[in-house]
Amino acid sequence: MKNLYIDFDGVILDTMEKTYKELEESGIDKKDHDAVTKYFRELDWEKLISETKEINNSIEEIKKICASKKFNVYILTHINSTNEMVQKISYLHKVLPEVTVVSVPKELSKTTVVNPCGAILIDDYSGNVKEWQKGLGIGIKFVKERENGDFPEITHLSEIINMFN
């Protein structure tokens, strides 16, 4: 079985759309690294997670992947604070108790914490997918609608089942 790592923000829940809108409404420039970091560290993650919608039925899609018995499934998520980590783990253990959560401090690359070689990453951020591939991993871009970009793309997580036999 291959190891399959699935990103959280922008793949499972649409937290990025909601937080980017709030950043804009607050007048915080997304290019101001310190201000953005402060915003994410002080964010009420419990509230955000409870108010944010799943993307393309992601929880059921992950359950289908687990049921296929083709992959060792992990959630691999960047975090800005301990509170963010606790809230994500708490949420995921309620809805996907069979899946292990790997939290990565935002200052580190996902490839620093997890060896990508031969493993699959599904992520909405092209930078993470590209870095994963550099580490000899299989990077797949999650998109809400097909972009026909530089990476293999999926719009529903369970599409991964038929990509690997």
Which residues make up each language-model segment?
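Active-site neighborhood of HAD-like aspartate-dependent phosphohydrolases
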Residues: 1-46
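Conserved Lys-Pro-Asp/Glu-containing loop-to-beta segment of HAD-superfamily phosphomonoesterases
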Residues: 3, 104-132
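Substrate-recognition element of Asp-dependent hydrolases with the DxDx(T/V) motif
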Residues: 49-54, 58-92
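A structural signal for isolated positions on well-ordered beta-strands in alpha/beta enzyme cores
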Residues: 72-74, 102, 120, 140
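A short, structured active-site edge motif that brings together acidic residues
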Residues: 74-81, 89, 95-112
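Structural recognition of alpha->loop->beta junctions
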Residues: 91-103, 151-165
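Acidic, Mg2+-coordinating phosphoryl-transfer loop and its flanking beta/alpha structural elements
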Residues: 120-155
